[in-house]
Amino acid sequence: MIFIFIIFVIVMVIFVIAAAIVFSDSGVVFENGRTIKGKEVTPFREIPCNKDIFLFYYLAKKLDIIGDDESRENLVSGFILKWVRDGIITIREKESGAIVKKKNYDMYLDVDAKFENKQETALYKMFILASKEGVLQTKAFQKWCSKHYKKIDDWFTKVDNVTEDSMNKNGYAKTKTIYKRLLFWNIPHDRTVWTDKAYDQCLYVWGFNNFLDDEDNMKEKAAIEVKLWDEYLIFAAVLGIADRVEKQLKVAIPRYEETTTYNNFPLYYYTHTFAHNSMSAASSAASAGQGGSSSFSGGGGGFSGGGGGGVR
């Protein structure tokens, strides 16, 4: 009897593991059954997703264009560039140190700024709360993120949930019953599939990434107005490639630095490092508070001077 019981337990364990694998909803499934080979997608020069940063971020993450380790800092970096472009924040250089002078930067925030999107409003409010009378120092935001890591984590979860709900409401995704083979049975299983509308946007996201990352299309890039590049670079930051794109622009458009909104200091390096260190501070605090496990990305590195919507 004991032997039969052991065999039964082993069979049940195997069955449960097999079921978990079969019914796992990881990865993107398109309703049309097609897949996307990202690097083979034709470059696309228009900003996808109706310029909705949150949808663009969500699709890029789900398509593994950006990994979980850097996706959060990329999104924050993208919004900082957006706010700089829109004149909502100003970043100013300052020197510190009595003997050895070191460059640092403070962020001056418009405390009365308003946004249509609730998630963008919530993110900006965190910056305001971490500031002192509208002036935000880099280390001050790191300390705030470390202390309020749960709010940071909740915000990113909310971003994903709101985007998923919006995709369902606007025809990008739907629930579909599919049948999967498990041992001798075809078992029905409800899961989210992405429609042709989402498939097209995913092609555009991949194509836009390929367009930005391509170093052999300098003539095409040179034909685009600088003010449009200021917007393109917001989305390049979300993809984590703003610094590489900027280097290309300096070659393609010799006077780019003189005419861009982002011309006063190494902005891409600053924004990325600012976001990276802040998210890392939240990650470390979350790991300490949860016994070493966290959904945040890790990493380190300091910064001090030197060179360089809604779904519709």
List each language-model region with its residue ranges.
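Acidic, Ser/Thr/Pro-rich intrinsically disordered cytosolic tails and loops
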Residues: M1-R312
